[in-house]
UniProtKB/Swiss-Prot annotation:
Its EC number is 1.-.-.-. NAD(+) binds at residues 10-34. Gene3D superfamilies: NAD(P)-binding Rossmann-like Domain. It comes from the Bacteria. Transmembrane segments: none annotated. It comes from Bradyrhizobium diazoefficiens (strain JCM 10833 / BCRC 13528 / IAM 13628 / NBRC 14792 / USDA 110). Keywords: Oxidoreductase. Belongs to the short-chain dehydrogenases/reductases (SDR) family. This is Probable short-chain type dehydrogenase/reductase blr2146. The keyword Oxidoreductase applies.
Amino acid sequence: MGRFEGKVAVVTGAGAGIGKACALAIAREGGRVVVADIDGSAAIACTAQIAAEAGHALALAIDIADAQAVAALFETAERHFGGVDLLVNNASAMHLTPRDRAILELELAVWDQTMATNLRGTLLCCRQAIPRMIARGGGAIVNMSSCQGLSGDTALTSYAASKAAMNMLSSSLATQYGHAQIRCNAVAPGLIMTERLLAKLDACMQTHLRRHQLLPRVGRPEDVAALVAFLLSDDAAFITGQVVCIDGGMLAHVPTYADGGNSRAARPAGETAEADAAPRC
């Protein structure tokens, strides 16, 4: 018997990447899944894959920054599946990241739109899920944060700020509704090779980022989905209010770890020690 038999999950941003991996993981363990994504065709494709594996899912196209649309999403989930037990807030305004620059170069419209989706959208989904979870005796929420929300960068100002705020939103929710048997945790992925990221990062940048990991491979969406499934399940029944990094050790080391002069720095598979003396990308 799967860990999510009899449970209903809403997963936003579930049409591709980490969100899709989460939806599949929940369905494979018996959960019924509402696959929500702004790209309706991607949501339908994910639902079709779940159905092909004998799972149960419903596809819905939604912009989570729209309060009325979010309310309709949860009403539909309740009408179709009888309630909501689990929520994965994964949707994020990733299409804005190329314009998400340093503070003085940042367009305010990018800041506003990023916050509207990443933070307001997460809040709206939580506000719809919490009463329904209370009605069913409790539930579990995972908010998809990022390592970007834990350390500064030369760009991605809006994205990082939204994810840092999401971490505190998760702690606040856990504090305010723990008495109602609702758990909430945030997951902070590092370098996870989704199709979108593979298309955006050239080989030089991938090599640079991998030097800052302690494990000799990049992360996969399935790695994150396994952590999310654990946090949603009864296996994590006493875990709440936490921000859990899944980054291959990217934030665990001293800043000089990946410097060329550090002979102990991790190297991509097949790379020799002589590469330490080569110019960096």
